[in-house]
């Protein structure tokens, strides 16, 4: 029997191998106990402040929206230690693992940011860790592979399937099933079997809580919308969580349209997929007519995922949040524009959210609106991917 509701409406659940059920229940109990433990919370907050660098700033874009009446604020998770929002919940889960007496950590990673966050947390807390990463992503994200190894992590390239994030997830689950007694799996997004979606949301919710306090101080009112990219959906649910009850604030999660939805080469399961069971949960899932998981595509390794966290599926199903999509090219354009006009190089993942916010501003230039974009990570890891794409266009001399 679970202590917390494992479902979000019809989405979520614990569809895991029987051997893992006691482990998931143990994790849930440890999380519930830790939430009510002042010592745990004090240690977590201390690490977030003194080690990770919270709170992160809320930055008004000075140049990006000239010619419109929109104000775009960036929630600067790119300035967090490790370079992305991933560090928040990894510190929380690593502390939970220590609390449970686990002596080994495993994780999956796509863009490498979750792997880097796991590696730094394990170095800090003296835990050995193994990171599973698709072989394609290892090539796309060489700087992050080096960073992980520099901090002592063992990085395992995964050659199965499309050699991307979903394949890394599968390998991590296999490892956990075989080694659950001494190993904790730090799942990198707000997806997977209960209690992971809830744990990750709660360890990321400070993003939205800080942003709410900061925007009230800056503008004296709440934003008209908060915008975040969605792969599995951890940065977005961290931003959305505190705003869900604020009915006047639109929640906009931006999925990757890849080469275009019509091509089939995308990673937009909410808008263009059916319900299915994947990675231990019921959610929207890209699958063919036989129910097999289809390959997703995005120029952004961190969004290259065929499913989505169950709370996002639920928020979409009840109409509380909208999930438009942005193509690779639109994300590349936004990446360049923020770099050129504000001096901030965003992650390609975050560039999807920014691209949609710019569409909102420019489609109604006379509309006075305040948008908060979650700048979930920095773009250092993407410079080679972007350089290759721009050379292909002849955009770089």
From Swiss-Prot:
Catalytic activity line of the entry: (1S,2R)-1-C-(indol-3-yl)glycerol 3-phosphate + L-serine = D-glyceraldehyde 3-phosphate + L-tryptophan + H2O
InterPro entries associated with the record: Trp_synth_b_CS, Trp_synth_beta, Trp_synth_beta/beta-like, TrpB-like_PALP, TrpB-like_PALP_sf
UniProt modified residues of type N6-(pyridoxal phosphate)lysine: 86
UniProt keywords, alphabetically: Amino-acid biosynthesis, Aromatic amino acid biosynthesis, Lyase, Pyridoxal phosphate, Tryptophan biosynthesis
PROSITE patterns recorded: TRP_SYNTHASE_BETA
Gene3D superfamilies assigned to the protein according to its UniProt record, in alphabetical order: 3.40.50.1100
GO cellular component, one term: cytoplasm
Cofactor section: pyridoxal 5'-phosphate
EC number of this enzyme: 4.2.1.20
Residue stretches spanning the membrane: none
UniProt GO MF annotations: tryptophan synthase activity
Pathway membership, UniProt: Amino-acid biosynthesis; L-tryptophan biosynthesis; L-tryptophan from chorismate: step 5/5
SUPFAM superfamilies: Tryptophan synthase beta subunit-like PLP-dependent enzymes (SSF53686)
Broad enzyme group: lyase
Subunit structure: Tetramer of two alpha and two beta chains.
Function as written in the Swiss-Prot or TrEMBL entry: The beta subunit is responsible for the synthesis of L-tryptophan from indole and L-serine.
Family the UniProt entry places it in: Belongs to the TrpB family.
Name of the protein: Tryptophan synthase beta chain
Organism in which the protein naturally occurs: Tolumonas auensis (strain DSM 9187 / NBRC 110442 / TA 4)
